[in-house]
Regions:
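Residues that form or immediately flank small-molecule/cofactor binding pockets and catalytic motifs
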Residues: 28, 48, 77-78, 138, ...
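Flexible, polar/acidic helix-loop-strand segments at domain edges
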Residues: 29-112
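Amphipathic, coiled-coil-like alpha-helical scaffolding segments used for oligomerization/assembly
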Residues: 1-56, 127
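Phenylalanine-focused residue identity feature
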Residues: 22, 49, 99, 112, ...
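Structural recognition of the beta-strand scaffold that forms the well-ordered cores
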Residues: 22-25, 71-72, 148-150
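Extracytoplasmic/secreted envelope proteins and their assembly/folding machinery
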Residues: 4-12, 28-32, 36-38, 66, ...
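Second-shell loop/turn segments in exported
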Residues: 1, 10, 16-22, 77-86, ...
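C-terminal solvent-exposed extensions
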Residues: 60, 64-67, 123-185
Length: 185
């Protein structure tokens, strides 16, 4: 919970003091469970994962089940293209398909959000009660999902020796205005 609270503080600071009321984090060990609760996610493999799973050859279209989902969204070191950009593109593709399937399940089964929460609870850290989370899932099921918001900036090695992202100030202000404010009429 402490790492989540530190993240809430960091995100609030990044977003120019915008309030972050709740948090929910999932341990990566929950990817397989989440994937399988959605019924598996079908993808066409642009990278070759066959050294990790023989069914995951480049060019194949497969429905990811169990550990295959984690291999798909996390792997980069065992691939010829070991960059994070390729992995991030896969993650965006995967999440779009996963969310669409979860939305469908939420629309068709009023109890699904509770079942999903119970299945994922060993992997979750959240400041939300079970009831609030279920009610929120039920409320947002009818929302129209917008494209992920991207803040421009640059990546460079920080004083600690690790790669860091430095947000473009104008892009950041624009994002905060888009997310948290409505134009006066």
């Amino acid at each position: 919970a402490e790492s989540c609270e530190l993240t809430v503080e960091a995100v609030s600071n990044l977003l120019l003091g915008a309030s972050v009321d709740f948090y929910l984090a999932m341990n990566l060990d929950g990817i397989a469970t989440l994937n399988d609760m959605a019924g598996g996610v079908t993808v066409t493999l642009e990278d070759d994962f066959s050294t990790l799973d023989s069914e995951m050859a480049q060019g194949a279209t497969i429905t990811l089940h169990g550990d295959q989902a984690e291999i798909y969204v996390r792997s980069r070191r065992n691939l010829e293209i070991g960059t994070n950009e390729a992995r991030m593109a896969r993650q965006e593709q995967y999440m779009a398909k996963l969310f669409a399937q979860l939305d469908t399940r939420l629309q068709s089964d009023q109890n699904f959000s509770g079942v999903l929460f119970d299945a994922l609870s060993p992997y979750l850290t959240t400041s939300m009660s079970r009831g609030r989370l279920i009610n929120t899932a039920w409320t947002v099921k009818d929302y129209i999902r917008s494209e992920p918001l991207e803040i421009s900036g640059e990546h460079r090695v920080g004083s600690d020796g690790f790669m860091q992202f430095y947000a473009d100030e104008a892009s950041l202000y624009e994002a905060v205005l888009d997310l948290f404010y409505e134009e006066a009429k």
